Amino acid sequence: MPTVISPTVAPRTGAEPRSPGPVPHPAQGKTTEAGGGHPSGIYSAIISRNFPIIGVKEKTFEQLRRKCLEKKVLYLDPEFPPDETSLFYSQKFPIQFVWKRPPEICENPRFIIGGANRTDICQGDLGDCWFLAAIACLTLNERLLFRVIPHDQSFTENYAGIFHFQFWRYGDWVDVVIDDCLPTYNNQLVFTKSNHRNEFWSALLEKAYAKLHGSYEALKGGNTTEAMEDFTGGVTEFFEIKDAPSDMYKIMRKAIERGSLMGCSIDDGTNMTYGTSPSGLNMGELIARMVRNMDNSLLRDSDLDPRGSDDRPSRTIVPVQYETRMACGLVKGHAYSVTGLEEALFKGEKVKLVRLRNPWGQVEWNGSWSDGWKDWSFVDKDEKARLQHQVTEDGEFWMSYDDFVYHFTKLEICNLTADALESDKLQTWTVSVNEGRWVRGCSAGGCRNFPDTFWTNPQYRLKLLEEDDDPEDSEVICSFLVALMQKNRRKDRKLGANLFTIGFAIYEVPKEMHGNKQHLQKDFFLYNASKARSKTYINMREVSQRFRLPPSEYVIVPSTYEPHQEGEFILRVFSEKRNLSEEAENTISVDRPVKKKKNKPIIFVSDRANSNKELGVDQEAEEGKDKAGPEKRGETPQPRPGHTDQESEEQQQFRNIFRQIAGDDMEICADELKNVLNTVVNKHKDLKTQGFTLESCRSMIALMDTDGSGRLNLQEFHHLWKKIKAWQKIFKHYDTDHSGTINSYEMRNAVNDAGFHLNSQLYDIITMRYADKHMNIDFDSFICCFVRLEGMFRAFNAFDKDGDGIIKLNVLEWLQLTMYA
């Protein structure tokens, strides 16, 4: 089960949130053959340049099936092949599974027999009861079911060994295409199977979901809410039943009426997700136990046709016991589906009932209202018929609501709209979706317990513009729901990834800062308490909660509990009225705009070099600046009294040193620049630097070169040196422990102090490019970063002929600009 952490933070102010409700049914999304997605938009320009070259455009299900039918071949999925790489990633097994297509397993295979229903799902030995419990819930809503399982496929008409299923994936609907090869042992399906031996929709759906996550093993252990959301695009609410509201039964009934999906479980005290095995049971032992079960089953069935008949029920095998079975028939640490709620008349009194289903297909509750309960004889025949009572071992059973509350500890509801289940009124909700990323060393700041880095987390401005329409509520309040979901952690399990412990906090933005979209700084969070926050930090894929706050502008700060944890997420905000949710981003700019010469053709290395000729003008202005730091934009720097003579003497000394190194041509190359800089820098022992590398000096020359000569003259070098001196002061300011490095989280402030204003994406890129493995930046890297920023801003301005912030380059210009940098 998930681990819950309640961090020690400033207490929340404002009203307690109501329990969240359900999500609008998403529109038709994009179709892709692959189970995975494309790189997110955050770094798409960078990632796409390194993305594998794709020879052909991705084909849709229809195109692939048509091609197979034309060639009269059965489809074989190259992305999820029928071999052990699609099964397990943690180890190889001596047991040999045989991949078979349904026509090879039985006669007359059918995709769906008599409609897809919850009895078609019998768990194999994978430990994915959480997934199967969600499927059982899905079968109760035919509209949702056939959104996930398209109608256009069968084993008869246009059969080509290819099937497809659709899942909601982080804001989009994706079409997952698979072949119909399934793993078998002794001609039995290894994993999920139907109650009918020749029905295969549930097994193929499980395979498509396994492909979406990279392997079957990736499905071992989870929370029902994950699959529920992937089937619907909904938002889940999570109840600890012992702390549930007094009208919980009413909430559950409305959830059933509105088509919401529900699952429940009994905590086993091990903090494991549903279906995970104890630490002492590895995958090899798990498979060995499974095979013994199947062998025993075969001994019982040895006299029957090994291919199986059309109508013989498949042999159901109780999975290896990761979970703990109780005397009452319930199983701890196991996911159940909630499939119905009713009130029955018994001995003159109404009794509230809950219908549950065990995805094993057997092992049921044996107490009051169970299938074999002795007091069914006192229940009216019509009541029995209404409750569809029958004594069958199908995993489904009734129990009283009182027994349900007594035994079960957790309830999960996946809502299909964002309407509160306590309300009888349905509203249309406004939805906004933001994608984000925590980058170690830059924007992975951890929770509020880590004040030095918390402020660096991604920030999202939320403008609540209109109050709710509720005549019975005198408060001026806006209702909204926040859902934070981490991405791809299950798919990346094979790389060692696990779910992070996540949560979020909500702060009100001061009125004077409304509308400016600036990233709020450390001091703001040190002296302002949150207005609301997630109830807990928890290691689940999604954390969601409903809030009620007055109209205003707020900032939502999503974070992991611990800092330095890197991952991607989406943040969804649902509100009853109009709202605006967007990432807080600074405008990209530099404090000292550079004059641009216009209408001159761009030749070779530089119009950038031409723009660098402006360095002399900037130098004269800078020499009159106060040592405290960069001037504000638009202010004219004034020379300090008595500064000219002192500067002239320094310039003369500088010229003499430069002439000694440069020679008669008064220009230096990269090697000579390295010697000059390191001679001076080595005198500053407090910098604790080993000096500049040759590659760093080459970059400095390329980015400061005004004539495209590949060398620096005195004026160019003087300007560079002035910059380095100014940046050195900034570096020392942030090197608080005198280690010769600064923490990468402080780089955002250092860059701002130097006059460069960037957005979060660029700060993340700087960290990835210049920080070491300990997330520290040394003096050499620090200066190289600033030189590059200075040079690239100047280069952009050189190419921005119209001053509109947009440049257009041909391939020659692009290569010249990037290669000589």
UniProtKB/Swiss-Prot annotation:
Source organism of the structure: Mus musculus
Name of encoding gene: Capn3
Catalytic residues (positions): 129, 334, 358
Chain sites annotated for binding Ca(2+) 3: 735, 737, 739, 741, 746
Subcellular location: Cytoplasm; Nucleus, Nucleolus
Cellular component terms (Gene Ontology): cytoplasm; cytosol; myofibril; nucleolus; nucleus; plasma membrane; protein-containing complex; T-tubule
Binding-site residues for Ca(2+) 2, renumbered to this chain: 705, 707, 709, 711, 716
Keyword Cytoplasm assigned: yes
Annotated stretches, region: Domain III: 418-586
Protein name in UniProt: Calpain-3
Domain Calpain catalytic: 74-417
Keyword Ligase attributed: no
